[in-house]
UniProtKB/Swiss-Prot annotation:
Its main location: cytoplasm. NCBIfam families: PRK09194.1, proS_fam_II. This is Proline--tRNA ligase. It comes from Acidothermus cellulolyticus (strain ATCC 43068 / DSM 8971 / 11B). Its EC number is 6.1.1.15.
């Protein structure tokens, strides 16, 4: 197929959009792939839609390869279905909710576990019907509080979601493995550099969970990997090595210290080292107690939660939220603290929390038997030698402290490294959360009901477009992998007359060879503008018909490496066909 730039619905831009935060957003807009409609909502133009469709087709092929069957569900879902699973409340403000003219409540689907489960329940009843894998590729909706980075975090996006239904946990494990391998093939074909990391399930429910993260500095998902073993996890699920528990026997008793004007850790450490306490102190010797508030799904009121971490670290709110999900968590406000005068900002200690009915959790780094300097629960006072297990006991542990490069691996003791990525896929062993909610059973060979177990597997199809753009670009523009490029060859006519004639012959020969061609036949654009647009648009092979036209020669450029070669027309067709076949 030949697409002509003179007819193509595209306008490239020389200036970056004002709201562009990351390269993919900037380049996809400038190259005419997408256009903004509203925050987090974008239209797909012909070039962008071509890339999106190619990614969809790769995903579809690999899903069919593992026995998946494609379906398509409505985006509009009645409230009752989400209430049955508990997610009407669990999703909170993330759901787009609406009413019809009769006042009935609906939502725009963020995922479709409930509908898949109900469909299978309505159609299948025997153990002989299982296992089954169903999938769809569909637009999803989430009311993101802060949509950003173009199509990386939008309020409307294209997603592949698939679901496996098995008779037992062994079957679920097999379906999970099949999806995991299919995802590896998909992302390999897309040309993405990615990591598979352990994750938490959150509001999705279930047990085992892994994310596929495209590695890029602009990714908003932090993850860690071990330099010594193959362990990798996002920061919500990371397991770091912690010190051994200590014996509190023989520890000195708590000591109240005068610490005026020390509401921060730095000020406290300076004050401690100005006192004659017989040792030097660092922030790691202090216990930082951070006041937060939580709200359970369906609850009307917020409850205070205090989280303790070593003073040389902060509370990682995203890590904490991932483990508390679906419970919402936010920093407590000054108004929240004003309602609890026992909590003295900057001087909060764990000793009174249980007595006043405030839940207290500590990071595992606050090991039993360890001694700390912490607040004395009155202004300008701290306490030294406060020992966990002797002077206070938390209500539980939760991984909440920020992770640092070089922290010990919880698996092998090696050193962890920090990196950033974009979540492009997520796989879950859901278990029976939804089949319990909707009582999805199959009659076994003995006539007894078997509760079906599920897996859930998502790929961000539209997000993958942005992830590829993040990894595959340079200062001049995009550089698409051949597997997803909107065309195989971008033919640039650098002049007029015989150059135009040869370019038409060349494009026709490429079309006959089965290649998709973008022919820049614009007569009102200079050669310089055409070259700049070719680099911006990013088709991997650029063929320039210029001065060599008189000799029947075209210049073939590799958009990625910059390599240029002059080839006779027939040789150029053969070369480009070979390159396209390797996509």
């Amino acid at each position: 197929m030949i697409q002509r730039m003179s007819k193509l619905f595209v306008r490239t831009l020389r200036e970056d959009p004002a709201d562009a935060e990351v390269p993919s957003h900037r380049l996809l807009v400038r190259a005419g792939y997408i256009r903004r409609v509203a925050p987090g909502i974008y239209s797909w133009l012909p070039l962008g839609y071509a890339v999106l469709r190619k990614i969809e087709e790769i995903v579809r092929q690999e899903m069919l390869h593992i026995g998946g069957q494609e379906v398509h569900f409505p985006a509009l879902i009645p409230r009752e279905i989400y209430e049955a699973s508990g997610r009407w409340n669990e999703y909170g403000d993330t759901l787009f909710r609406l009413k019809d003219r009769k006042g009935a409540d609906y939502l725009l689907g963020p995922t479709h576990e409930e509908l898949f489960t109900l469909l299978v329940k309505g159609e299948y009843s025997s153990y002989k019907d299982y296992p089954v894998i169903l999938f769809q590729i569909q637009t999803k909706y989430r009311d993101e509080a802060r949509p950003r980075a173009g199509i990386l975090r939008g309020r409307e996006f294209v997603m592949k979601d698939s679901y496996s239904f098995d008779l037992d946990d062994a079957g679920l494990a097999a379906s999970y493995t099949a999806h995991r391998e299919a995802y590896r093939r998909i992302f390999d074909r897309l040309g993405l550099r990615y990591r598979i990391v352990s994750a938490v399930s959150g509001a999705m429910g279930g047990s085992a969970s892994e994310e596929f993260l495209a590695v890029t500095e602009v990714g908003e998902d932090a993850f860690v990997y071990c330099r010594n073993c193959d362990y990798a996890a996002n920061t919500e699920a990371v397991e770091i090595g912690v010190p051994d528990r200590l014996d509190p026997t023989g520890q000195p008793p708590p000591q109240v210290l005068d610490t005026p004007d020390t509401p921060t850790i730095d000020a406290l450490v300076d004050r401690l080292n100005s006192l004659d306490l017989g040792r030097r102190f660092t922030a790691a010797d202090t216990l930082k107690n951070v006041v937060l508030k939580t709200k359970a799904p369906g609850a009307d009121d917020w409850e205070l939660l205090v989280v303790g971490v070593p003073g040389d670290r902060d509370v990682d709110l995203k890590r904490l939220a991932g483990q508390l999900d679906p419970i919402q968590v936010e920093p407590a406000t000054a108004e929240d603290l004003a309602r609890r005068p026992e909590l003295v900002r900057g001087y909060i200690g764990p000793q009174i929390l249980r007595r006043i009915g405030v839940r207290y959790l500590v990071d595992p780094l606050v090991v039993p038997g360890s001694a700390w300097v912490t607040g004395a629960n009155e202004p300008d006072k701290h306490m030294a030698n406060v020992v966990r297990g002797r002077d206070f006991e938390p209500d539980g542990e939760i991984g909440a402290a920020t992770i640092r490069d070089g922290d010990p691996c919880g698996r092998c003791g090696g050193r962890l490294a920090l990196a950033q990525g974009i979540e492009i896929g997520h796989i879950f062993q859901l278990g029976r959360k939804y089949t319990d909610a909707f009582e999805l059973d199959a009659l076994g060979p003995d006539g007894r009901p078997i509760r079906i177990t599920m897996g859930s597997y998502g790929i961000g199809v539209s997000r993958a477009v942005a992830a590829i753009a993040e990894q595959c670009h340079d200062d001049a523009g995009l550089i698409w992998p051949r597997s997803v490029s909107p065309a195989d060859v971008h033919v640039v006519i650098a002049g007029k007359g015989e150059q135009e004639k040869l370019a038409e012959e060349f494009a026709a020969a490429l079309d006959t060879a089965g290649l998709d061609v973008l022919l820049d036949d614009r007569v009102d654009a200079s050669a310089g503008v055409k070259f700049a647009d070719a680099e911006l648009i990013g088709i991997p092979s650029i063929a320039v018909v210029g001065r060599g036209a008189a000799r029947g020669v075209v210049e073939v450029r590799d958009r990625g490496s910059g390599e240029r070669r002059e080839l006779a027309l027939t040789d150029a067709v053969a070369e480009l066909r070979t390159l396209a076949a390797g996509a």
